[in-house]
Structures are given as structure tokens and as C-alpha cells.
Amino acid sequence: MKKISTFIITKNESARIARAINSVKNITDEVIVVDNESTDDTVHIAKTLGAQVIVKPWLGYVGQKSFAESMCVNDWVLNIDADEELSQELQDEIEYIFTSHNQDRYLAYQIKLLIMYRGDQKPRMFAPLNKCTRLYNKKFASFANTINSTTHDSVVFNKDVDFTGKIYLLNGIAYHYSGTSIEQLVNKANFYSSEQAKDLVKQGKKLSNFRLATEMIWCFLKAFFIRRYFVFGFDGFVDSIIFAFARFLRLAKLRDLSLKSQNVITSDNYINYCMDFKSLLQQKKRNRYPKK
């Protein structure tokens, strides 16, 4: 028995959702798609492939994934994004673990995500690779445990859970396909940076002008060299600039929100200000013309 539920959040992913669902539907009991009111064929395609689709207005990345997670009937859940695909090797590995009833040796499993550049049919040598927890028992961990963030959507263990030695890195890989176009990447950068800026305000983050001035340069170098976007050639150079601009935007928007909050005068504050100002004038008048 499989006893795995897969959940995916979507928004206008008609070009990629089929690939994601097809890579998990044979190793899971159910596929839950929580869609943020897509205007394309995402919902139709997902339903055609047998997924259970729930249309849900946007709750933020963490909120949307937490809701999708709560809709899963099984304790063991697998989360992938619409732009991801499990390799056949990874599918076989997960299936073996669960058919042999060895899944409970660990509380969670990490997956290696290999970035595939748009249009590529196979991974490039030295392509960027990330590790993240995507297969886990939701009795012990959840996206809902994320604190003070709507954008950093990561699986967090319950406070009373000792997960030392209880996370296993799977050998198989999953493919993460980069944006469908420059326009899509820019739109995502604009939306995501706005969400991040709101989070930073809630967290009380402070910003220096030096940080704002150097953020884009540092983040470009980080993406192009440390994250190895250089393996994608000039296209990687362009994507590194977009990544750096997105990181700059979140700080610029944070500064903008902070300045606006400092200049806000509520009705109560305005009344109190007027009363204080009136009292000050009366005090000055008394000091200037003391009673005889």
C-alpha cells in the first residue's frame, strides 16, 4: 500500500502541471492541487489527470501550502511545485521504501532538486542543486509551523520533536525547471518581492542605505558564481541579474513601506496632536501674560 498524499499549489501552470502530476501519480494514493484562481487550463488539466482540485484564494506561500497539506488524508505527504518533476529513479526509490514498510525509520526525507534551464532536455554539467525536505510525516512536521513568514515555505518540525538522525537524504533527484520566459521571471520577482517586503516589516527588520546600495551587486555575484548560474552561459547571466533585482526590490519595497508607516497619521493621533498643540499655545500665553 502506498499511503502517500501529494500536494501541489498552482497559479496559471497549464504549461507545466501535467509533467509534475505524471511524475507522482503512480507512487501516491492521491494528488491534491490547490489552485489560486488560475485563468488558464491548469484546473482542467489537473482534473483530467485524476488530481483532486481545490480552488483557494491566495493565502501566501506558507498559508497556501499549509492548507493543501491539511487536505491530505494520509500522514505521509509529498510536496512538489508545479515546475518540478520526480525522476524515475526517485519514484522507484520512494516506492521501494513504502512497499517495504521502511518509511517510519525516519520522520522526513530530503530530495535533491537539480535546476533545468528552460528548453533543456537533460541536465547541464555542474548545474545548481538544492536539498530540501519534501517527503515527511505531517504528525511530526508541517509547513504550518513556519513563524513570521508567508514566503519562506519550508517544512518545520514540531517543537517537541527530536529529529536528530531522523532525516534521510534520498539518492534520486527531482528536476526543477526554471521560469517559462523572461516575462514570467520578472512578474514572479515583482510579486514575490512584495510578499517578502511585507514579511520583513512584520519581523521588524531594519535596513541600512549601504545594504540597499550593495544588495544587487552581491546577489548577482552569489547567483552567478556561488549558485553556479554560469553553467547556463549568457542566459544564466540574464537570470542572475533578474534574481539580484528581485532581492534588491524586496529591500527597496521594505524601505518604501517603512517610510509610509512613519508618515501615517491616524484620526486619534491627529486629535491628540491638536489638543497638545492647543495646550502648548495656552501655556505660552500664560507665561507671556502672567496674572497680576
Swiss-Prot record:
Identify one Pfam family in the record: Glycos_transf_2
For this chain, the annotated S-S bridges are none
Enzyme class per UniProt: transferase
Supply the alphabetized keyword list. Glycosyltransferase, Transferase
Q: Name one GO molecular function term.
A: glycosyltransferase activity
Instruction: Provide the E.C. number(s) assigned to this enzyme.
Output: 2.4.-.-
The highest taxon in the source lineage is Bacteria
Q: Does the keyword Transferase apply?
A: yes
The UniProt entry, under InterPro entries, shows:
Glyco_trans_2-like, Nucleotide-diphossugar_trans
Checking PANTHER family in the record gives: GLYCOSYLTRANSFERASE, POLY-BETA-1,6-N-ACETYL-D-GLUCOSAMINE SYNTHASE
Similarity field:
Belongs to the glycosyltransferase 2 family. WaaE/KdtX subfamily.
Q: What's the protein called, per UniProt?
A: Uncharacterized glycosyltransferase RP128
Highest lineage ranks of the organism?
Bacteria, Pseudomonadati, Pseudomonadota, Alphaproteobacteria, Rickettsiales
